[in-house]
Amino acid sequence: MTDILKETGTQEYKAFLTGDNNFRYKVFPEYKANRLKNARPIHLKACNEHLVNNWNAVVTDGCEADDLLGIEQTALSHEVDASCIASIDKDLLTIPGKHYNFVKKQWTLVSPQDALHSFYTSLLTGDAADGIKGALGIGPKKSQVILAGCETEQEYYNACLNFFSCEDELIQNARCLYIWRKENDSWNPPS
């Protein structure tokens, strides 16, 4: 944490940890089912306790840490350089704003259009780590061909819809992949 604060040039931060309760399990009961419980790092509990006790990390209830990061970044988006998400998780690139990958020591500025493109790319390709399959036979290269030329959310949605067995499957995947921008947010198809 000290290194991240130094590298990002700030002393102000909010840290979030994912708790046990997560709405995504209600949306998709197989969410993260492919992760073995005993495959978690042996010192994870001690690390989380350290972050809570020494760095004032907040443990989420009902959502993931990613969602609280998305809410904070969105709330501060009107102020230039007011917020930055420090994470190695590519899923967070669906949130507009500044991002810092503290392992690669890399800054990324994600525009609203970049965030939309990243979300729909994830929708097509799925997220193996979370057990979300995506559209059958669609990988990163095919997804870029499918999404080429899309500008509006409606265009992205329509482009993706053709590659799912039904609209309900697309909606279920999208609701699991979508990172909140406000409290108790939910993804809905564009209308």
What are these regions (language model features)?
Residues 10, 34-190:
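Extended two-metal-dependent nuclease catalytic cores across DNA- and RNA-processing enzymes
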Residues 1-50:
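Domain-level signal for Mg2+-assisted phosphodiester chemistry and nucleotide/NA-binding surfaces
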